[in-house]
Amino acid sequence: MMEKLIITAAICGAEVTKEHNPAVPYTVEEIAREAESAYKAGASIIHLHVREDDGTPTQDKERFRKCIEAIREKCPDVIIQPSTGGAVGMTDLERLQPTELHPEMATLDCGTCNFGGDEIFVNTENTIKNFGKILIERGVKPEIEVFDKGMIDYAIRYQKQGFIQKPMHFDFVLGVQMSASARDLVFMSESIPEGSTWTVAGVGRHQFQMAALAIVMGGHVRVGFEDNVYIDKGILAKSNGELVERVVRLAKELGREIATPDEARQILSLKK
């Protein structure tokens, strides 16, 4: 029998704006409301970027604190997973600020990626090792974000060097640097160490295709406005909750139960 399905909601990201979808949250209140919509629909993890009220991405620790407190009021047991990716161009010190709050999880990007145009999301070897070391020191479990197979190899190397601890949890972000096909997902899932867990974030039109594949393959799923603002072709999603609801329906139709936050903690070996 497969593990229950962990659904992560990436509710706002750093790149998508209200011009893409008016429901994208910026303010503390909007972020908390979107987190609640995803949580009530079945998400057990909130992947969190935060914004200033005008939509500018920020890694400010106090802004994260306010957003986390507001989310906790509405979703007391949800797992909150701050991003250490921040936004393109931020310094390492800026990106690490939310980990000072000692969340249960945070992301760890294991390589550099072209984001389109002149944007390069830079993660040098020294950056990755430093982030890994600090996450261990602060008791934060990394979700290892990988955009292609080479980043899995980097993560395995850094684990052997002591900068990442087992069991490892990966997030395959497909449809950016690497294509998003069934073959790609099988290849990625078979390339990680035994005993690891994984989730997939299909970007744009790939979101629900990748979700369906992950459900039947025994992986987990990330959806949300960060990766996709449409519920169907040409139809904007009204909320992150609507995106989560679609994954829940898929899972039920395919015979996969949904994990609660505490069940997700057990699957991911988290310490609450």
Curated annotation (Swiss-Prot):
Protein name from the UniProt record: 3-keto-5-aminohexanoate cleavage enzyme
Lineage: Bacteria, Fusobacteriati, Fusobacteriota, Fusobacteriia, Fusobacteriales
pH dependence: Optimum pH is 6.5-7.0. The half-maximal rate is observed at pH 5.2 and 8.1.
Pathway listed: Amino-acid degradation; L-lysine degradation via acetate pathway
Keyword annotations from UniProtKB, A to Z: Metal-binding, Transferase, Zinc
Cofactor: Zn(2+)
EC code(s) of this entry: 2.3.1.247
Organism per entry: Fusobacterium nucleatum subsp. nucleatum (strain ATCC 25586 / DSM 15643 / BCRC 10681 / CIP 101130 / JCM 8532 / KCTC 2640 / LMG 13131 / VPI 4355)
Gene transcribed to yield this protein: kce
Function (record text): Involved in the anaerobic fermentation of lysine. Catalyzes the reversible reaction between 3-keto-5-aminohexanoate (KAH) and acetyl-CoA to form 3-aminobutyryl-CoA and acetoacetate. The reaction involves the deprotonation of KAH, the nucleophilic addition onto acetyl-CoA and the intramolecular transfer of the CoA moiety. It can also use beta-alanyl-CoA as substrate.
